[in-house]
């Protein structure tokens, strides 16, 4: 006779074992109709699953985050159902959920086209609208394998052979004639799966291994209702307009080409933004008392073996050989900074030492994962490493946190998600070391009044980390900043300092990055601003233009005055109508356009317009130079007249 405890503390007693759905029905028909699954003693379970012992139960509906994920997972199965009807020879691999949707990897002897996607989506909707029940059956391992062998599904058989114990009882989900295998839970009925959209097809290696066969990955999105789907598709349209690859080409910021995959060719305007970011971060390094260093981009394999990178990171490292020695191009800067620390005797009085570098790093990311500036193989980190005592951990992490928020606020990012990533399965160091490291970061977050999410097993192999994820104007999350605590690497590389008792101690090392990859951060802010960079970052801050040839000398004079004041200004003396010039430079997202006609020359002034179309009136040259200098110095986000 199980007693079921509900979220409000009330209890219901049943004479016999009872399913999640039956509990919902006992509460009310409306709740039963809305029930997708349940959370039994904190564990997600299917609506048909039986509860035979006293338990706590939360009903999961489409309004819950878990409910939406279950809908998406069930839509992946619905995709399998539909594609099997249209392409009976297709082999199904895996179909998990992802942010905002799902995908399914399939093996088909022809490339899927947009027309195929449209047909699959149409069949999915036809099937879903029949509102058929999804039937779950627990079977033996052998029965599951026999089922998929009979159905000609080699990838499902491989999953059973390699990932599931022979004593297990896998769950098979029956969608009418289609059968899939999954941990679940799934929706009880397809009435929950009416609002979806198939988006694209991409290549994906089976098990993510390039030695395996390339499969076709079908991506889709799914939502609880029509309104949510429409809003998401609208956000996607806006994201496409803001795509940094599209804007980067339109504004001539950079390009990438096949001969250098994942590596950036910076053009003048893009490199201007890059250097401005470096300059800005350097001012903060000085403010927070860092020293700037520069390490070599390549070091002997022996050093990387000592750090543990060779054993844990080799697949992502580029290597080369010379004079019978093997070298690795650095994927990160930390080992080089320890070498700098090791030069000369250090005392506890010298600590903390805060060492920063704009380090050029390379990682051999899979070609299929490369994406504009967001995922590259060569990148520059605004990296720093702090060498300190254990007693200094909390104060130093606090200083890093303040620096993170200080810098992000300059770019207008205020919605920042904080995550604490704990020890991964593949790691160096003992549990006692990891306990101290994780506790140190957690204490610093608590001391700074920050709420955070724990990401179990997501830390680096050498230490736990705090991650700072920016939420942008389209409600997307970008992980940028990190603060990592490392008790292991300094000891592996023989770093030490003389303690107060004259004994030798190993310093604690704090890894810190704020922008993360400068390349990626430029991609993020390009999309955040839609290319309308704030004045201090804009490659060209002002364009001075004439109306007729008679104003050419005056235009040059104004341009020189702006340039002499450190403002990035250009003149436009082309024989075009001024309206044409204004439109062109507006499309180029230039913050200010200065028009010089006969009236302006006579008054010794300039007429100023913004890229947003605002007419700011006339200013003397000196007035506008001073105003613009102050705006750039303040690194404000808004143009004149927008305050």
UniProtKB/Swiss-Prot annotation:
Q: GO CC terms on record?
A: cytosol
| Annotated keywords | Aminoacyl-tRNA synthetase, ATP-binding, Cytoplasm, Ligase, Metal-binding, Nucleotide-binding, Protein biosynthesis, RNA-binding, tRNA-binding, Zinc
Q: What is its EC number?
A: 6.1.1.3
For whether the record's keyword set contains Signal, the answer is: no
- The protein's predominant localisation is cytoplasm
Q: Does the keyword section mention Methyltransferase?
A: no
What are the required cofactors?
Zn(2+)
Q: Which GO terms describe its molecular function?
A: ATP binding; metal ion binding; threonine-tRNA ligase activity; tRNA binding
Q: Which GO terms describe its biological process?
A: threonyl-tRNA aminoacylation
**Top class in the EC scheme:** ligase
Any Pfam family hit:
HGTP_anticodon
The record's SUPFAM superfamilies line, in alphabetical order, gives: Class II aaRS ABD-related, Class II aaRS and biotin synthetases, TGS-like, ThrRS/AlaRS common domain
User: Cofactor note, please?
Assistant: Binds 1 zinc ion per subunit.
Region: Catalytic; residue ranges are: 243-534
Residues annotated as domain TGS: 1-61
Any idea where this protein resides?
Answer: Cytoplasm
Q: To which protein family does this belong?
A: Belongs to the class-II aminoacyl-tRNA synthetase family.
Q: How does it assemble?
A: Homodimer.
**Record's function text:** Catalyzes the attachment of threonine to tRNA(Thr) in a two-step reaction: L-threonine is first activated by ATP to form Thr-AMP and then transferred to the acceptor end of tRNA(Thr). Also edits incorrectly charged L-seryl-tRNA(Thr).
**Protein name, please?**
Threonine--tRNA ligase
Species this protein is from: Actinobacillus pleuropneumoniae serotype 3 (strain JL03)
